[in-house]
Amino acid sequence: MSRQDVQRLLEEYQLIGELLSSLQAQHATVAELLEELTTALDGVRLLKGEGGERLVHIGAGLFVKGVFEAKEVLAPLGAGYHAFLDLNNAERILQERIEEYSKLKTSLEENIEKLAERAAQIRQALERLGIR
């Protein structure tokens, strides 16, 4: 293996490391969004349920106790806009977003796995050459 080949492997290894860091940060963000969406979906489903007193998560581990007669929720539409949605539409939209972000999370996991495998291959090749 020529010196240029070794240099290319080292550069590729460094680039893969940077890409992995970026993808892992994106994965963490998507996982947090999924958790938030799931919590919101649970809250909407609670509001759709029979009347009576209940605890509803309002974020940051906080819950509010009370009797809720809400038939609509204020939901973000994007670009700073919000709209009131009936509970069925809110539930549908949340489910769609959860599905979308779940697919993205799976895709990120697959890409992370592929890059990690390539990094391991390069690391092994470099170790065989006595480079660490």
Swiss-Prot record:
Origin superkingdom: Archaea
GO biological process, one term: protein folding
Lineage, broadest ranks: Archaea, Thermoproteota, Thermoprotei, Thermoproteales, Thermoproteaceae
Chaperone as UniProt keyword: yes
Record HAMAP family: PfdA
Location of this chain's protein in the cell: Cytoplasm
Transmembrane segments: none
Family that this chain belongs to: Belongs to the prefoldin subunit alpha family.
Source organism per UniProt: Pyrobaculum aerophilum (strain ATCC 51768 / DSM 7523 / JCM 9630 / CIP 104966 / NBRC 100827 / IM2)
UniProt keyword list: Chaperone, Cytoplasm
Protein name: Prefoldin subunit alpha
Gene: pfdA
UniProt subunit comment: Heterohexamer of two alpha and four beta subunits.
A cellular component term, taken from the record's GO annotations: cytoplasm
